[in-house]
Amino acid sequence: MGCASSLPDRNSGTLSGLSNSENAVPADAKNLRVKLVLLGDSGVGKSCIVLRFVRGQFDATSKVTVGASFLSQTIALQDSTTVKFEIWDTAGQERYSALAPLYYRGAGVAVIVYDITSPESFKKAQYWVKELQKHGSPDIVMALVGNKADLHEKREVPTEDGMELAEKNGMFFIETSAKTADNINQLFEEIGKRLPRPAPSS
């Protein structure tokens, strides 16, 4: 289950609302705006990660995302750079897979999420890595996230497997828990640090 029911209807994404703008659009070198898309199997907690990051909330009883949801959040990094994330949370159900390229086209960041208790979701994460390598922007920042780290007693995907997949594909890896908020802010802070910076104007 996702956290989609906690998101207002006005934030639901539609195809007409998609933008193919630049991957990261700076107002200046210290103010960045970037389109971020979350990909992964249904039920891995993509919406819960977004809701925890944007609103500091967690809803274990919510419904799955249908289509896609849109939210935005701005953070300040230690170097005084501000990053505005325009976050597209895509549906994980198989019938929506064909729509995913419409959401990650033009994205500067892709966050691929799997559930550490679900080997099947890890296989799907590998699929999304390949899809992004084929069709994503060449300079896209990619993160691999093993979610539900609080369920360590039910773990079926070793941490080492996630680390290996990320290392092989030039991604960074982190394990999170949307339920406890563990590593959620750290995930987005690390993404912000890895975004390309515009050259200073002369």
Swiss-Prot record:
Query: What's the domain of life for this entry?
Result: Eukaryota
InterPro entries recorded for this chain?
A: P-loop_NTPase, Small_GTP-bd, Small_GTPase
Name the consequence of C3S.
Loss of palmitoylation
> What processes does the entry annotate via GO biological process terms?
early endosome to late endosome transport; endocytosis
Tell what triggers its expression: Activated by VPS9A.
Q: Does the keyword GTP-binding apply?
A: yes
Q: What membrane topology is annotated for this entry?
A: Lipid-anchor
Q: Which residues form a coiled coil?
A: none
PTM statement from Swiss-Prot or TrEMBL: Although this sequence lacks the C-terminal cysteine motifs subject to isoprenylation in other Rab proteins, it does have N-terminal N-myristoylation and S-palmitoylation.
Gene3D superfamilies, per the entry: P-loop containing nucleotide triphosphate hydrolases
Keywords, in A-Z order: Cell membrane, Endocytosis, Endoplasmic reticulum, Endosome, GTP-binding, Lipoprotein, Membrane, Myristate, Nucleotide-binding, Palmitate
Positions of S-palmitoyl cysteine lipidation: C3
Annotated segments matching region Disordered: 1-20
Q: Which SMART domains match?
A: RAB, RAS, RHO
Residues reported in the UniProt entry to bind GTP: 40-47, 89-93, 147-150, 177-178
Comp. bias regions, Polar residues: 8-20
User: Where are lipid groups covalently attached, annotated N-myristoyl glycine?
Assistant: G2
Family membership, please give it: Belongs to the small GTPase superfamily. Rab family.
Q: How does it assemble?
A: Interacts with VPS9A. Interacts with TCTP1.
Q: What is this protein called?
A: Ras-related protein RABF1
Species of the source: Arabidopsis thaliana
Classification from the root reads: Eukaryota, Viridiplantae, Streptophyta, Embryophyta, Tracheophyta
Gene name, Swiss-Prot/TrEMBL:
RABF1
